[in-house]
């Protein structure tokens, strides 16, 4: 199984290395750039923005090939995919494709944020219809098993919230993709340890193209036309995928009495969720549109200290790991609601200490 997971990662990674240069070439030919403006870090350079458009196709190809290989080599577990999880995977593919289309339209021609929001809700509804919804909050807000009447709206809200959290935090090179890589590595390990091998393969299949993209995003040179951004296609798809994996983990790891399954499912995305929640509240308090981007995210706060993008990337990734680890460990010993309060207080304190505004001159 470890060999199969490794081959899955390499397959997706190699495909991304082959496809991303083609996307860059087409982007320059057709003029699909991230437009420079005063808000963006790269405010003086035209850089292609379609790096994430290959995530879904590569993931689909890799999953099809490797799950088929697993069926031939490991029939004792893979056969389960074609019974209870069959509809979940099918509906996940359909809902991911819906969101992929909305993201691609935005990257290619631009669409209003309300349109993208509608697409996210549609994707969430499709997933709930498949039977993949949050049926147990494991003590959060004092609730445990819940009915579809409550579970469906909560699931759709979680999907939209996490999807936007990843989309919003995609502000400096490698940040959204590295957070997603950390989350996917985590999901792979936990699903593997819980013998949910099908979801482990899906997690690795998602990680491969993201890892390949990161090489071009982090180390590409704009002057040599080797740099590319993820775009909304990539960030929306990855945010949606992480939310679905979180819902799946919440449903299928309930047999472990030592860990809170709700925390297990959503611990990797705590930091981006806290960040988007704070940013939206600040924008609304200032009377601004919650979906109009600014320079008030956690990475902007660190950059206002004069730190480079790569240093900020490492700091935020470390914070992501710290918040996730603390949530998982604390939830073993204390009430999940107290865990949430403690983490919120830590996050609030961190944002109070850091500067309130991004200073362009320091950048």
Name every feature range the model reports, one short phrase each.
Residues 2-276:
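"…together with the soluble PPM/PP2C metallo-phosphatase catalytic core" -> "…together
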Residues 250-363:
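C-terminal membrane-associated helical module and adjoining short loops/tails
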């Amino acid at each position: 199984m470890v060999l199969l997971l490794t081959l899955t990662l390499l397959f997706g990674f190699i495909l991304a290395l082959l496809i991303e240069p083609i996307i860059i070439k087409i982007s320059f030919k057709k003029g699909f750039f991230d437009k420079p403006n005063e808000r963006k870090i790269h405010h003086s350079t035209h850089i292609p923005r379609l790096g994430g458009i290959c995530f879904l196709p590569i993931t689909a190809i890799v999953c099809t090939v490797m799950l088929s290989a697993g069926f031939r080599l490991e029939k004792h577990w893979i056969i389960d995919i074609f019974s209870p999880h069959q509809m979940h995977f099918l509906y996940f593919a359909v809902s991911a494709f819906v969101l992929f289309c909305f993201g691609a339209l935005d990257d290619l021609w631009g669409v209003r944020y309300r349109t993208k929001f509608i697409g996210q809700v549609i994707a969430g509804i499709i997933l709930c219809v498949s039977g993949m919804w949050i049926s147990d909050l494991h003590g959060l807000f004092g609730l445990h098993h819940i009915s579809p009447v409550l579970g469906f709206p909560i699931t759709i809200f979680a999907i939209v919230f996490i999807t936007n959290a990843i989309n919003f935090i995609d502000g400096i090179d490698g940040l959204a993709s590295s957070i997603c890589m950390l989350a996917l590595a985590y999901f792979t390990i936990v699903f593997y340890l819980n013998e949910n091998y099908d979801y482990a393969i899906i997690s690795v299949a998602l990680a491969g193209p993201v890892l390949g993209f990161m090489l071009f995003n982090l180390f590409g040179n704009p002057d040599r036309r080797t740099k590319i951004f993820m775009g909304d296609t990539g960030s929306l798809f990855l945010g949606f995928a992480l939310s679905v994996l979180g819902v799946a983990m919440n449903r299928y790891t309930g047999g472990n009495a030592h860990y809170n399954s709700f925390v297990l499912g959503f611990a990797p995305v705590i930091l981006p969720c806290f960040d988007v929640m704070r940013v939206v509240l600040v924008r609304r308090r200032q009377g601004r549109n919650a979906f109009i981007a600014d320079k008030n995210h956690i990475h902007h706060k660190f950059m206002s200290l004069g730190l480079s993008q790569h240093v900020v990337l490492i700091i935020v990734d470390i914070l992501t790991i710290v918040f996730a680890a603390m949530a998982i460990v604390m939830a073993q010993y204390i009430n999940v609601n107290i865990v949430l309060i403690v983490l919120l207080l830590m996050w609030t304190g961190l944002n109070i200490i850091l500067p309130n505004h991004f200073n362009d001159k320091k950048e």
